[in-house]
């Protein structure tokens, strides 16, 4: 046994490589052991330091893989499982346990998170050389019983099936202990690099090999000052020093100091010594000069995105200045990998910097996992429509085109069907021939056939089930689709998809191993497959050696690269505080360690935090050979953050914090580097003139199109492919002639008028192009309205001999039996429930009709307008016709005055501001149409809300009070003529603001005609502006801006071309209500008409 240590600015790998070469010269075969996270880097470094750059006698490997290189006499007869297989075994054993048998974990026994934690605990106990029976020492009785039962069942199952989950080190330990290793130990040597602690399993291997006479060399970083100090607690080198002291004591071998004498102390050595003296409370006088501050820079940035851009620019600049540099000379360290992963790809692709993030990716969100999840959901939830749509959307099932999938989805949404029997029936329903039923039935059979065959599978042996699954993948064209999808991808992405497919096949292999000979149902198989895929991870290797490596900062080793950029070093990320998320608490781990024999140790993360983090900081400061950049953003994940205390210490020593910002207001040589990045800088620079005070979050193409469009506009040029703002063209004359022939009547409805004043282009889409909403066969708001209208129409037409309640019930019964409504509301339990709710609404609304003796209903669903009577006359002599339907016409019994009623599903009131702006013309239009048909005597026009009133019981003192308050909301809302208001009862909301004189009534009708005239002239001229209205001058309401994907209108960029609603000109702070508000708007109407 030989123990070495060196100062952190001397390459430990170089020293240990020399030791390895000496051992080779002595005839030894050397295993150069490195930690898992550093093995690839160590291999490259060792090859560089070897005098011949190669050696057949030196193998750079990891502890776990060393067993492969030693010849074992008896290979284990058992089949080895990996984590996926072990997870499946846990899933199977837990599924067989009754929830009542588990006191703590019964309710979550098949939860993926619990299974993951059980796997981790299984591995931890194996590495710590601890037996599962040691769990008997747990003090929590319920947890002890559960864990012992679970591990006992899993262990019995693995032994029964000749399955092994032991690590390779366990096999090696067993082989060495039983003399089953045929390799000559005298010809073997170990060189161990990069460790500051061994697991119990690793230490056991070292102990056994040392006992067999194997020469072992172990090296670590430590200063002589730290190693010889009698007190190491809190020291930066505490982790490595304690490690060396433990080994020196155990093997009675003092550690040798191999530190080299450096001619000049570099900046990083200086920072290391200052940090060390700070933590061991010794005094050290060292001056930090400008060169040191240049070599070790501390950046303060605003955002993570800015950090990455600054790093990318810096790399590009250095490559531009020094042609000898390449990407492999740079290393990027991340404070939090997940937070930077997406932005990293976007920005580095923009700057054309190849990078490799050595991180495993989870398969949980891959389309292949979603494919399995959709099939499981189809089986488990009996063929829901949404699950079938999700399956088709993965683009992995069947070779149907996107247009076929869209047509099929549209049709099954129209039908609203669920359940396999419904899908097995031939499609026969169509909406006026809109759907191609013949084609849809061909698609239905193509989609259902493989699924029907698969779902017909009963519980059977795993081997047979896998055969059926293989047939399903072939018939469903899954493998073909995956292959076709990957052929169009880049080479790197093709490799990624290949790794995904390997992981998928591996899950199936592990399933076959674990369940060999077992009876498995299809649903259990799909659940296990989905569970295995959710636990699976895959990773790719870099396509080239010359790439910028990106990794988490806590995996760094000293002297890794020439230039190192460590970003995201906030207080939350540096230091990283390891949290215990396992099934055993720190206290339970401590108790188990004390109760078991020496050498059997579970790791307690919290006890390792301090010494591990200080050593990590030391490695971080010394990670660069030439220049190191440490950065912390002020905003991390959109919340304020502080820089790490370690960075503040460096600043205290004399290193300077540099405020770094991206400056788009000027261009400099730093913007040079790559074509894409330069173009991006130019775009950002030109953006400043129009949007300097707003934070942009647009794609590169959008920004570029806006800037180029602006430049073209300045030159008097136009490119319709890149407009500066959304605009529409006036329709051509021949188009207008085809749409609105001079000899043909032009009709404009009140709903069309409202749509026009909401957004002119929306009118064009709906009423000119005929854009329709998605069809639904199931009952919707329209069918609910028709149902209620029909009930009231029938109830009011029945003879008055019976009471109103009897007539209403008769109307409900007869309407419910109509074929149209019977088909809709008897289709499903959900539809029947909806019908009951609607009937409650009908009975509640009937309360107003039942107790209203002052009026009588003379017409229901009355049509108005038509060819006989023009609504308005345009200046060019062309007539505009309005036609529509009034829900109900009432007449006052006292004097025969007419009133118009419109049913609404929610509370609707007449509002003068909306009427003035063309958004509330329904009631005036009804009155004007009836007046043109000869009616002269009116009492008003109103809305009736058809809904059950909701009253908060907290706002009233008694139930009787609730009834009174609820009845207040059940009133007719609208416009009433002042002279007739005395005849109207309590069911009419006839306050002063809603009452009109004859002159005011006529004024409203005149202005309403004016609104129709303005709209008709624009429509007939073919001018449809993209101008959704804004009520507050800051945003557009969602129901106004329904066609954003078509128009491209974005409120935060194009608000200037929105229509700002006209408002009253009031003095600051003045507010009008009631009668005064009405009079102010009427005066504004007079002014508008007199212009």
Swiss-Prot record:
Alphabetized UniProt keyword annotations: ATP-binding, DNA damage, DNA repair, DNA-binding, Exonuclease, Helicase, Hydrolase, Nuclease, Nucleotide-binding
Q: Enumerate the Gene Ontology biological process terms.
A: double-strand break repair via homologous recombination
| EC code(s) of this entry | 3.1.-.-
Q: Which cofactor does it need?
A: Mg(2+)
Q: What else is known?
A: Despite having helicase-like domains, this subunit does not have helicase activity.
- Subunit details: Heterodimer of RexA (AddA) and RexB.
The name under which this protein is listed is Exonuclease/helicase subunit RexB
- What is the organism field in this record? Streptococcus pneumoniae serotype 4 (strain ATCC BAA-334 / TIGR4)
Gene encoding this polypeptide?
rexB
């Amino acid at each position: 046994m030989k123990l070495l240590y060196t100062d952190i600015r001397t390459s430990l790998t170089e020293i240990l490589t020399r030791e390895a070469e000496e051992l080779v010269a002595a005839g030894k075969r050397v295993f150069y052991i490195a930690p898992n996270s550093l093995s690839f880097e160590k291999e490259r470094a060792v090859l560089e330091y070897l005098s011949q750059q190669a050696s057949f006698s030196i193998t750079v490997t990891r502890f776990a893989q060393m067993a492969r290189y030693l010849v074992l006499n008896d290979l284990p007869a058992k089949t080895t499982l990996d984590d996926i297989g072990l997870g499946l075994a846990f899933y199977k054993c837990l599924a067989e346990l009754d929830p009542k048998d588990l006191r703590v974990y019964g309710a979550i026994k098949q939860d993926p998170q619990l299974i993951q934690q059980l796997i981790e605990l299984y591995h931890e106990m194996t590495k710590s050389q601890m037996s599962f029976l040691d769990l008997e020492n747990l003090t929590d009785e319920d947890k002890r019983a559960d864990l012992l039962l679970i591990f006992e069942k899993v262990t019995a199952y693995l032994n029964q099936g000749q399955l092994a989950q032991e690590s390779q080190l366990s096999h090696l330990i067993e082989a060495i202990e039983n003399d089953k290793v045929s390799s000559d130990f005298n010809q073997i040597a170990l060189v161990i690099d990069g460790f500051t602690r061994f697991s119990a399993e690793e230490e056991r291997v070292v102990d056994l090999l040392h006992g067999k006479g194997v020469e072992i060399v172990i090296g670590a970083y430590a200063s002589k000052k730290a190693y010889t100090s009698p007190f190491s607690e809190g020291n930066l080198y505490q982790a490595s020093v304690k490690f060396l002291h433990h080994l020196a004591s155990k093997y009675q071998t003092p550690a040798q100091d191999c530190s080299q004498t450096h001619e000049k102390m570099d900046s990083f050595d200086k920072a290391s010594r200052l940090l060390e003296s700070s933590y061991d409370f010794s005094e050290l006088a060292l001056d930090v000069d400008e060169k040191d501050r240049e070599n070790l820079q501390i950046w303060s940035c605003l955002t993570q995105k800015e950090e990455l851009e600054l790093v990318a620019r810096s790399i590009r600049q250095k490559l531009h200045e020094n042609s000898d540099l390449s990407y492999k000379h740079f290393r990027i360290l991340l404070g939090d990998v997940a937070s930077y992963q997406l932005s990293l790809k976007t920005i580095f692709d923009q700057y054309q910097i190849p990078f490799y993030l050595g991180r495993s990716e989870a398969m949980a969100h891959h389309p292949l996992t979603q494919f399995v999840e959709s099939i499981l959901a189809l089986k488990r939830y009996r063929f829901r429509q949404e699950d079938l749509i999700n399956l088709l959307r993965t683009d992995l099932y069947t070779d149907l085109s996107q247009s076929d999938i869209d047509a099929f989805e549209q049709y099954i949404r129209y039908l609203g069907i669920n359940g396999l029997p419904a899908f097995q029936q031939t499609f026969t329903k169509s909406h006026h021939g809109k759907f191609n039923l013949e084609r849809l039935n061909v698609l239905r059979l193509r989609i259902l056939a493989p699924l029907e065959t698969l779902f017909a599978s009963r519980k059977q042996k795993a081997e047979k089930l896998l055969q059926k699954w293989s047939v399903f993948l072939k018939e469903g064209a899954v493998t073909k689709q995956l292959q076709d999808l990957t052929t169009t991808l880049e080479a790197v992405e093709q490799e990624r998809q290949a790794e995904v497919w390997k992981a998928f096949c591996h899950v199936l292999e592990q399933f076959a191993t674990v369940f060999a000979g077992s009876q498995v149902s299809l649903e259990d198989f799909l659940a296990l497959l989905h569970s295995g895929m959710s636990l699976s991870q895959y990773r790719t290797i870099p396509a080239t050696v010359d790439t910028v490596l990106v990794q988490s900062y806590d995996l760094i080793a000293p002297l890794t690269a020439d230039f190192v950029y460590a970003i995201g070093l906030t207080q939350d990320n540096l230091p990283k505080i390891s949290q215990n998320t396992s099934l055993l608490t720190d206290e339970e781990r401590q108790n188990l360690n004390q109760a078991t024999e020496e050498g059997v140790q579970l790791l307690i993360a919290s006890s390792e935090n301090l010494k591990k983090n200080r050593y990590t900081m030391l490695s971080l400061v010394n990670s660069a050979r030439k220049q190191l950049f440490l950065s912390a953003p002020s905003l991390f994940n959109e919340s304020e953050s502080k820089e790490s205390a370690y960075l503040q210490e460096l600043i205290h020593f004399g290193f300077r914090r540099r405020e770094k910002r991206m400056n788009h207001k000027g261009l400099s040589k730093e913007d040079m580097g790559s074509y894409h990045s330069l173009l991006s800088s130019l775009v950002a620079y030109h953006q400043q003139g129009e949007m300097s005070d707003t934070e942009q979050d647009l794609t590169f193409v959008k920004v570029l199109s806006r800037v180029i469009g602006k430049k073209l506009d300045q030159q008097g040029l136009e490119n319709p492919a890149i407009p500066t703002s959304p605009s529409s063209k006036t329709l051509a004359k021949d188009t207008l002639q085809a749409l609105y022939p001079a000899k043909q009547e032009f009709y404009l409805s009140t709903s069309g008028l409202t749509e026009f004043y909401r957004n002119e282009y929306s009118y064009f889409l709906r009423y000119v192009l005929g854009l329709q909403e998605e069809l639904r066969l199931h009952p919707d708001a329209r069918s609910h309205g028709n149902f209620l209208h029909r009930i009231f129409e029938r109830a009011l037409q029945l003879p008055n001999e019976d009471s109103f309640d009897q007539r209403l019930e008769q109307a409900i019964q007869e309407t419910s039996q109509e074929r149209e409504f019977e088909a809709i509301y008897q289709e499903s339990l959900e539809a029947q429930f909806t019908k009951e709710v609607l009937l409650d609404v009908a009975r509640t609304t009937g309360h107003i009709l039942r107790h209203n003796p002052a009026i009588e209903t003379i017409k229901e669903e009355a049509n108005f307008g038509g060819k006989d009577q023009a609504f308005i006359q345009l200046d060019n002599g062309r007539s505009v016709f309005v036609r529509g339907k009034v829900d109900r016409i009432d007449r006052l019994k006292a004097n025969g005055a007419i009133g118009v009623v419109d049913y609404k599903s929610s509370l609707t009131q007449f509002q003068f501001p909306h009427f003035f702006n063309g958004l509330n013309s329904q009631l005036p239009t009804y009155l004007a149409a009836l007046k043109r048909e000869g009616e002269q005597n009116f009492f008003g026009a109103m809305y009736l809300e058809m809904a059950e009133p909701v009253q908060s019981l907290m706002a009233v003192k008694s139930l009787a009070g609730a009834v009174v308050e609820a009845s207040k909301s059940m009133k007719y809302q609208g416009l009433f003529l002042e002279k007739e208001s005395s005849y109207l009862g309590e069911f009419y909301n006839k306050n002063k603001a809603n009452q009109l004189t004859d002159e005011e009534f006529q004024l409203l009708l005149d202005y309403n005609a004016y609104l129709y005239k303005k709209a008709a002239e624009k429509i007939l001229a073919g001018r449809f502006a993209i101008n959704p209205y804004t009520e507050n001058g800051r945003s557009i309401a969602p129901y106004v801006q329904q066609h954003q994907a078509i128009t491209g209108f974005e409120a935060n960029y194009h608000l200037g071309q929105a229509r700002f609603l006209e408002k009253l000109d009031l003095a600051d702070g003045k507010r009008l209500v009631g009668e005064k508000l009405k009079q102010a708007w009427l005066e504004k109407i007079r002014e508008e008409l007199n212009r």
